[in-house]
Amino acid sequence: MNTKIKLTYKDVPYVLEYDRMSVKTLEASGFSVEEFVKKPMSNIELVFAGAFIKNHRKTKQTVIDEIFSKTKDKEKLVETLALMIEETYSSLFDEPEGDEGNAEWEVVDLSPKTSHK
C-alpha cells in the first residue's frame, strides 16, 4: 500500500489512498474487482470516492463528484486507483517480519484411519 494520489482542488490538499478498512467499506458498498475490470465505467466513481475514505472520510459526495469531474487524465487515474486497490489486496499476504511472536500453525489430518489386514 505504497501508492497514493496527491491532488489539490480549490486550494484544499487531498491525499487519496486505500487501506484494508477503506477497501472493506468499498466492498460493503457493492464493489468487486471482477466487476471493476468488466465494467470500469459503472464503478469508477465508487472507486474514486473510496480513495477518500482513509484520509478524508467527511468529504461530502457532492465535493468528491465535483473533484472527479474536474480531474484530467482519467485513464491514468483509473489505472492508478486500480493499482492502489491491487496493492491493498496484496498486503493481505504480506509475511510478518522476524520470527518472534508470530503465530505458528499446522494442518491436522482428522480423516478416519483405516487398517489393512
PLM-predicted stretches and their roles:
Residues N43-K54, E79-E86:
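Short, hydrophobic/amphipathic alpha-helical patches that form generic packing surfaces
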